[in-house]
A protein has these predicted regions:
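Membrane-helix boundary connector in multi-pass membrane proteins
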Residues: 90-107, 126
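Interfacial loop at the N-terminal end of multi-pass membrane proteins
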Residues: 6, 26-51, 94-101
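Core segments of alpha-helical transmembrane spans in multipass integral membrane proteins
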Residues: 18-27, 42-66, 82-86
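Hydrophobic alpha-helical membrane segments
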Residues: 57, 77-91, 115
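Membrane-water interface at the C-terminal end of transmembrane alpha helices
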Residues: 115-134
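Physicochemical signature of membrane-embedded alpha-helices that form the seven-helix bundle of GPCRs
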Residues: 12-15, 56, 77-80, 105, ...
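Individual transmembrane alpha-helices with interfacial aromatic-anchor signatures
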Residues: 50-51, 101-116
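Interfacial segments of alpha-helical transmembrane regions
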Residues: 2-17, 66-81
Length: 134
């Protein structure tokens, strides 16, 4: 059971890495960002911020891969996935009707990642409390 939880943690981290690497295409410019998020990027300031966001997400993706390959960092990586994705889910909920269909897709992907990362972390904590190594 323990190795399965550990394996699941690796899968969740790699899935999160893939999801966070996809926006890197946004660095290429407004057309790619339009395809990803269905937002107008005519304003240069917004375009700069979104392109920078794409780079930051790629850095996160690399960190998630590193954590997946480092057993001692998996819980840290899963916690990062949880914080990153839960923050978007919370902000999206507070934003009300501000989501277009593309952002709703991002929202639901993040809901799944929140559920998966929280589940693995809870199982790991439970195993530690019960005296097993997760």
């Amino acid at each position: 059971m323990i190795s399965r939880v550990d394996d699941l943690g690796v899968v969740v981290l790699l899935l999160a890495a893939l999801v966070h690497a996809l926006p890197l295409l946004g660095v290429l410019g407004g057309d790619q960002l339009q395809k990803l998020y269905a937002v107008q990027t005519d304003e240069p300031t917004l375009l700069l911020l979104l392109r920078h966001r794409a780079v930051l997400f790629a850095v996160l993706a690399a960190v998630f891969v590193y954590c997946a390959m480092s057993p001692s960092l998996r819980s840290v990586g899963l916690s990062m996935v949880l914080v990153c994705t839960a923050s978007f889910v919370l902000l999206a909920q507070l934003g009300g009707d501000a989501m277009n269909p593309a952002l709703k897709r991002v929202f639901w992907v993040d809901v799944i990642l929140v559920s998966l990362s929280a589940s693995v972390l809870l199982i790991q904590v439970g195993a530690r409390v019960l005296g097993a190594k997760a």
